[in-house]
UniProtKB/Swiss-Prot annotation:
InterPro entries according to UniProt: Beta-prop_IFT122_1st, Beta-prop_IFT122_2nd, Ift122/121, WD40/YVTN_repeat-like_dom_sf, WD40_repeat_dom_sf, WD40_rpt, Zn_ribbon_IFT122
Major localization class: other
Species of the source: Caenorhabditis elegans
Domain of life per record: Eukaryota
The UniProt record lists the keyword Zinc-finger: no
Keyword Transport: yes
Annotated function: Component of the IFT complex A (IFT-A), a complex required for retrograde ciliary transport and entry into cilia of G protein-coupled receptors (GPCRs). Plays a role in chemotaxis and sensory perception. Required for entry into and exit from the dauer larval stage and this may be mediated by daf-12, daf-16 and daf-41. Controls the behavioral response, namely the avoidance response, and pathogen-responsive gene expression in the response to pathogenic bacteria such as E.coli and P.aeruginosa.
Subunit structure, as described in the record: Component of the IFT complex A (IFT-A) composed of at least che-11, daf-10, dyf-2, ift-139, ift-43 and ifta-1.
WD repeat start-end pairs: 17-57, 58-97, 99-136, 138-176, 236-275, 277-320, 475-513
Protein name, entry field: Intraflagellar transport protein 122 homolog
Any one of the GO BP annotations: receptor localization to non-motile cilium
């Protein structure tokens, strides 16, 4: 810091004999005027000129204090006459008010027009908004006052050492904070809003302070407090201070007092130096707003104005830059990665040096060595910098230059250089012939670094840390100002006092280049050929061979790393991007592609990389071209370079390589010209055909052979196909003889006529193409054409598959008849076709014809299981009956007793599910199509069956209870309800309530069934209980029921004697009985106790044919003979399932459903195999098998 005296003056008394004390000073906010409180007047000075402008009179006694408002419209004065006078901007008194005692100090609010005035025993607040002065008595004398920076709080220092802090809105309120101190009076208070002030908490951790208050007293103490009254720290002064003021936005602190010296401190109270030495006590000090100008007043009337100049202390090493901050801090930046670190030294920083990871800082009485510990490695470079104190050299060395290396500190004092280690031990010294003007570290191994220095006699020397003898590199005429050496230590650049920069070869001493008017020069740290230098506001970046880039309006260049220069502009080091386009083009023009690549790697734009790549490719510099194309990620050109390198390794001449490059860059005619000039007409022809330039290829094709012309036709066909002209492409392929490719193209474009035409031309040995054509004809439904092709290649299997896939069953059956080996290929898909349409009997016969018995059984079993699980019990009964027939058929061929038992089991399940379906509908649906009597009979039938899957006994007994109760069978209803009490009723059926109601109601009914509801046995003629069983309880004769109404039919089973065959028995029954035995009944005359009725030949011959029903079953099941006891009741028999029915019920069921209600056999049953020739949408060429043909 260097103070410059601007002007000095002295205020004398009225007799101009002795000076008067200057009690207070105040700058106008715009800095143009300075107020002085001296004697009983207010003096105005012109700050710029230093002359007295005006003297204001209005006070009758000494004026102690003056203050300007924040906007410069008002200023105030007060003094021993107890008056406060307000003056306007024209220096006219506008208002005055008084206190009860001497006015000691005053200050305007920094944000509004509120004035704080302090007398000895009171203080008050005045504002332009409220003309009344709000006053508050003070027990202790008021000595000083100050507002904080935002005007919300004001502080008053008292004579007993206490400080009171109050809110700026009301003076009458009690102090919000009272700071108790020693008994010494507080003569100065100042606030600073600098947020970088740091204190420490109770645990020793640093904490930030928003705003601080500095306080001075005559106990020779400078103290700091926060706004909440917390003590921060204190500093001891060697004098009695009287005035204090912050300057430069709170960065520094000015204090004056009894030692007659105005001193400058840091914001933390660290002494930095002296501003001025006066002859008497310094009583007041103030700082000009927004400037570095300081005014001070002394007891003897002296007024002086100084301008503070802060010199720049800095150093640079490659991309790292360190500079002094706030006089006591070192701020280190890595300008390349934009990271930084602030080092607090708590002392005045005099000099510093930076090298690699080391930083040396000279303080007042010591030198501190720091080591970079954060942001060093490649992975941490983008993280925050961190420096740690490594060593301290506690010596007060005097020197002009200082540099640091890995393990040493080198200082220079005039002609002498001294080397110290980090412990302060002197290791080596060098004595030069003249004063050393410039010193820097070039680098080198640790503890063996190289220094370069310049002297005032023009000598440039190189010094090694471990060598006692300096080496002369160059001699200039005048003193050396700046030196640098390139990266490979071959070229030296030096600037002398005449500002002439010379570049010379270190080995030979030859001058390579000279430039006048240079202020600084630096070589690039990566590329030894690049350097930068500055002239008059110009930055030049060039090489020794050619001029380069020039930028206007920069300072001094201090560093040059990769594509960035670091220039010092005033006090800031600014990184500037260097465009290398000019240098790149210069190297390319000279044909030096390797150096051009090195320049490009420092940083050029994408277009420059492309230009370098293309030029290197033209020059057949494939390595450079590959690296350049890789930078722009041009994969196409990278592949081309790879192919060119491969061609070159295979011995291809340069002419072919250049022609290939021209072809890749779409210069086809130039490439073809090179091909023809070098005797490669074939390559020229391939080039033109690949690019579909057929007009140009004709010139090359004049002497071509037939095979070559065919190749041309193929190329044209390929081009036509790619150009979306497939028809032309097909014609070209036909002309060239590529019928297989032409056929594929015709098929892809769906040209049926061309496909028919080409099918006659294709060789029959080309099976693949013929099959593709036939597949195309099948898609177009041209089955005749496809069949003709298959026949021509003798592929009968494909014909069968074609008819099967198309559903042409008639044609498929005809082929299967002619060729038995294709029976399975025809009937197996046909069986699946029928099964998908629920034509299961026909599907089973088809499966049987195809020899797939297991698959037929699996399909039927799966359908049966699904029907039961889905509660489709009518279908379940039907499927179980079909399943029983299948088991029965298989038992005949395999003679397996297990299959016979399965057939019987399936038949019984069929009966049960058939009977359960109306019961299920009655319980689960609101309406039923069956009569209640029939449903009751079916439920009665189910009560005597064992437990079967999905047949609910709850539904069975609920049906009996409900219908029997309605029809007067109260006993049966009560029995059914009793059974329900032993069963669990599922809640989803919602039957619990109905069952409970019926149970209560049935108690009021008689425990009997009406006689009409009791089944009668047609053999003994006695009635049976409704729930008595499926056989008579008297004679044990089994009941035979009608499978529509489930009523008991008047049928009694009889058997024939063992020696009578079935055919004989049938013949006897069908014979005409004797006239005398028209009403013959075999039950008459039977003895009691006989259960089975066995008839001999005589009895059979007496039977009426219409009274006998014969049920025939496939072997090994025996036929059954049933006798109609009541011939007046006509009995119907289904020939499909052999079930017997009441004729009226059977006819009604068949009329309603169109088939037998049990086995679904239609009336027009036809067991013969036939084919329906009609083709319609629902039934196209589908053959029918037997009795189920109508129920698909």
């Amino acid at each position: 810091m260097r103070p410059n005296l601007l002007w000095v003056d002295k205020i004398l008394d009225e007799n101009n004999e002795a000076g008067v004390c200057i009690y207070d000073l105040a700058f106008k906010p715009d800095g143009s005027e300075l107020l002085l409180a001296a004697d009983n007047k207010v003096y105005l000075f012109d700050v710029n000129e230093g002359g007295q402008m005006q003297t204001l009179k209005g006070h009758k006694d000494l004026v102690y204090t003056v203050a300007w408002s924040h906007n410069g419209e008002l200023f105030a004065s007060g003094g021993a006459d107890k008056l406060v006078i307000l003056w306007n901007e024209k220096h006219e008194g506008t208002l005055r008010y008084s206190h009860t005692d001497v006015i000691q100090c005053m200050m305007f609010n920094p944000c509004n027009q509120i004035l704080l005035t302090c007398a000895l025993n009171e203080f008050g607040l005045w504002s332009t908004a409220d003309k009344n002065v709000i006053k508050q008595r003070s027990v202790v004398r008021c000595c000083s006052c100050a507002w904080n920076t935002d005007g919300t709080i004001f502080a008053i220092g008292h004579g007993d050492g206490t400080i009171t802090l109050r809110k700026g809105t009301n003076a009458t309120e009690e102090p919000s904070i009272i700071i108790q101190r020693d008994n010494e009076p507080i003569w100065g208070i100042a606030f600073s809003s600098n947020r970088t002030f740091a204190s420490r908490d109770s645990q020793g951790n640093p904490m930030g302070i928003d705003e601080i208050m500095a306080v001075i007293d005559w106990n020779k103490t400078l103290s700091f407090y926060s706004l909440d009254g917390t003590f921060i720290e204190s500093k001891n002064l060697e004098f009695e201070p009287h005035c204090i003021s912050y300057c430069l936005n709170g960065e520094y602190l000015l204090i004056g007092g009894s030692d007659k010296i105005l001193k400058i401190y840091t914001r933390k109270g660290v002494l930095l130096g002296t501003v001025a030495q006066m002859d008497h006590w310094i009583w007041s000090v103030t700082v000009r707003p927004n400037s570095q100008t300081v005014a001070m007043g002394c007891v003897d009337g002296t007024i002086a104005c100084y301008n503070l100049v802060f010199s720049t202390v800095h150093c640079v090493d490659h991309a790292r830059y360190a500079n002094r901050k706030s006089m006591t801090d070192v701020f280190v930046q890595n300008l390349e990665y934009r990271t930084s670190s602030n080092i607090c030294c708590h002392d005045l920083v005099k000099k510093m040096s930076l090298y690699d990871t080391k930083l040396a800082v000279q303080l007042s009485d010591k030198i501190q060595i720091y080591k970079q510990t954060g942001g060093v490695s490649k992975n941490e470079r983008r993280k925050q910098l961190k420096y740690t104190l490594q060593d301290t050299i506690r010596k007060d060395l005097s020197f002009s230059l200082m540099v640091v290396t890995h393990g040493h500190l080198v200082v220079c004092n005039d002609e002498k250089l001294e080397c110290y280690d980090f412990k302060g031990i002197k290791k080596r010294s060098w004595n030069m012939k003249s004063i050393v003007r410039y010193l820097r570290v070039l680098g080198g191994p640790a503890h063996r670094e190289t220094l370069v220095l310049g002297t005032t006699d023009g000598g440039v020397y190189k010094v090694f840390i471990d060598n006692d003898y300096p080496i002369l590199l160059d001699s200039r005429k005048t003193a050396i100002k700046c030196i640098d050496i390139n990266a490979n230590r071959t070229v030296l650049a030096s600037i002398e006092d005449t500002l002439v920069c010379k570049w010379s070869d270190i080995a030979t001493g030859e001058t390579l280049l000279q430039e006048p008017g240079c202020y600084s020069v630096v070589f690039n740290t990566v590329n030894e050929n690049l350097f930068a230098f500055t002239t008059n506001n110009m930055l030049h970046v060039r090489t020794l061979a050619a001029p380069g880039h020039t930028t206007r309006g920069v300072g001094y260049v201090l560093g040059f790393v990769k594509n960035r220069t670091f220039c010092l502009v005033q006090y800031n080091l600014i990184p500037l991007e260097v465009p290398y386009t000019i240098h790149l083009y210069q190297y390319i023009e000279r044909g030096d592609f390797k150096e051009a690549l090195r320049i490009a790697c420092l940083g050029v734009v994408k277009n420059d990389w492309k230009y370098l790549a293309n030029k290197a490719l033209d020059a057949l510099e494939f390595d450079v071209a590959r690296k350049a194309y890789k930078r722009v990620r041009d994969r196409k050109m990278l592949r081309m370079v790879w192919e060119l390198k491969k061609m070159k390794s295979n011995g291809e001449p340069d002419a072919i390589l250049r022609a290939t490059i021209l072809a890749y860059t779409k210069k086809f005619r130039e490439a073809a010209k090179i091909f023809k000039e070098n005797g490669f007409e074939n390559r020229a022809m391939e080039l033109f055909t690949d690019m579909r330039m057929f007009d140009d290829v004709q010139e090359v094709m004049t002497t071509a052979s037939g095979e070559t012309k065919k190749m041309l036709m193929r190329k044209r066909a390929s081009w036509a196909r790619d150009a979306n002209q497939p028809k032309i492409a097909a014609e070209m392929l036909i002309s060239s003889g590529d019928l297989d490719k032409a056929a594929l193209l015709i098929i892809d474009n769906d040209w049926l006529e061309l496909a028919i035409e080409i099918s006659h031309k294709i060789d029959r040995s080309d099976l693949e193409t013929m099959k593709k054509l036939s597949a195309y004809f099948i898609r177009k439904h041209e089955f005749g054409l496809a069949s003709r092709i298959f026949q021509s290649i003798n592929d009968m299997k494909s014909i069968v598959d074609m008819h099967v896939n198309a559903g042409h069953w008639t044609d498929a059956f005809a082929i299967a008849d002619r060729h038995p080996k294709y029976v399975e290929d025809v009937y197996l898909p046909y069986a699946r076709f029928l099964a998908e349409r629920d034509r299961f009997e026909e599907a089973q016969k088809a499966f049987h014809r195809a020899g797939k018995e297991q698959e037929a059984m699996h399909v039927l079993e799966q359908l049966t299981s699904n029907s039961v699980n889905e509660n489709r019990f009518a279908d379940a009964g039907f499927y179980y009956w079909l399943l029983s027939q299948q088991y029965l058929d298989r038992s005949q061929t395999e003679e397996n007793l297990t299959l016979l038992n399965k057939a019987k089991e399936a038949a019984s399940l069929a009966d049960a599910y058939y009977a359960y379906y109306p019961v299920f509908i009655f319980c689960s649906q609101p309406f039923s199509f069956e009569r209640n009597e029939n449903i009751l009979n079916m439920a009665r039938y189910l009560t005597f069956t064992p437990y079967i899957d999905n047949i609910s006994k709850v539904f069975v007994y609920f049906t009996i209870a409900k219908i029997a109760n309605e029809m007067g069978a109260y006993k049966s209803a009560r029995t059914a309800l009793d059974q329900l009490t032993n069963l669990r009723v599922l809640p989803q059926f919602e039957l619990d309530g109905q069952i409970e109601v019926m149970t209560l109601n049935i108690r009021a009914k008689p425990f009997t069934d009406v006689e009409s509801m009791q089944p009668m046995c047609y053999r003994c003629g006695l009635n049976n209980p409704l729930l008595g069983g499926m056989s008579c309880i008297h004679c044990e004769t089994p009941f035979i029921i009608s499978f529509v109404s489930f009523d008991i039919l008047p049928l009694i089973e009889f058997k024939i004697e063992n020696d009578i065959s079935f055919d004989e028995a049938k013949e006897l029954i069908e014979s005409e009985p004797p006239l005398s035995d028209d009403d013959y009944n075999p039950l008459r005359g039977l003895k009691k106790g006989i259960k089975e009725i066995i008839l001999n030949r005589e009895s059979l011959s007496k039977l009426e044919q219409g009274h006998v029903i014969i049920q025939t079953f496939p072997p090994p099941l025996a036929p059954k003979f049933l006798f109609n006891v009541m011939p007046s009741i006509t009995i119907a028999q289904c020939k499909g399932c052999n079930k017997v029915f009441d004729l009226d019920d059977f006819e009604m069921a068949c009329l309603r459903k169109g088939h037998c209600p049990f086995c679904r056999t239609s009336y027009d049953r036809n067991e013969a195999f036939f084919v329906d020739e009609e083709e319609d949408e629902d039934n196209t060429n589908i053959p029918s098998f037997g009795q189920f043909s109508r129920f698909s």
